[in-house]
Amino acid sequence: MRKKILATTAMAAAAVLGLSACSGGDDATAEGSGELQIEVPDIAMQEELGDYEGEVNIVAWSGFVEAEWSDAFTDETGCVVNRRVAGTSDEMVQLMRTGDYDLVSASGDASLRLIAGGDVQPLNLELIPNFGDDIVEGMKGQIYDTINGKSYGIPIGRGANILQYNSEIVTEEPTSWDVAWEKDSPYAGQVIAYDAPIYIADAAVYLMAHEPELGIENPYALDEKQLAAAIDLLKQQNEIVSEYWSDPAAQITSFAGGTTVLGTSWEVLRKLTEDDKFKSVLPEEGSTGWSDAWMLATESKNPNCAYAWMDYASTPEVNGAIAMNFGMAPANAAFCETSEEAKAHCDYFHATDEEYFEKVWFWTTPIEQCIDGRSAEEATCTNFQQWTDAWLSVKG
């Protein structure tokens, strides 16, 4: 089964602590501008392509690199694709630091760690012609992979963390996350929640709508007071939660077996239940979500094959094949027009519905620089280590 589990280890936390604010924090902007200014290693961008080296070594989520399309890539380029499947973002970060891999399909909770650690290099988009107009705008220049005006990631796909429910018990579609957060929920004791420090952001999204006096503008930019409020809410939720999940298979089993009535999910997990009684909704408060991108190792031994792969994997056909195999919205919107099956997939995962994804706050590693626009003089935000420590207190 597919996993995207934010790691909680000290190594991951230490990596994030390397992210520090530049002077002039007023230059930092929020989601999607590509104007976040932080201190990162000054790594040169590749200027032109050379001869293919004969192989490319990729760390990827299960389902992203399969023989169905990688064999054709090898036939076209002579670059043999060597795949290593990773189960967590932390594992991906650690593997990329071994120097053995050229590419990684990083999620937003790993990308800033890799950029700040000097593990990945900025990309020359002119060498990736398929990164063009057909790539959905909502996946270009995002804060989690575009730093100081430089692009570090080529988008693959995205998804929202939605509210899933058993419609035989929850007979009216919920409009709010309150049924999963408030202690007077009629479904107390039958609620499932995600098990990772990044889930703190879900609490922050809820607080943005219900306690605006806290001043939360970005769920990944929490000062100490705001983090404390999120933890208080999570501890309240803990009293009504029957189960936490990090293994997607366990989440599906919990719903199918009747232990869980509602809670956090992904659209693909609802689909995999193969039971129409399970419905999903993106509540009025919005939600968190995830977005994956190809990132190139700074010390890549096979950069030309790696660039060729990023371009190849960005074609409508291959990007769409990855999206369908994994269960997510593709980055290349042109895929949606290739067949009726493709259109149905895109409709199911809201591939080109930017109004839908405008309500989604994609996973971003929390850092001390407040990425909501507050300057260093105005506030210091909490980092990943602090989130990790705080999360450990939630479940007791």
Q: Which residue stretches match the model-derived regions?
A:
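C-terminal motif of bacterial Sec signal peptides marking the signal peptidase cleavage site
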Residues: V16-A21
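Extracytoplasmic ligand-binding site segments that recognize negatively charged/polar headgroups
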Residues: F64-E66, S105-S254
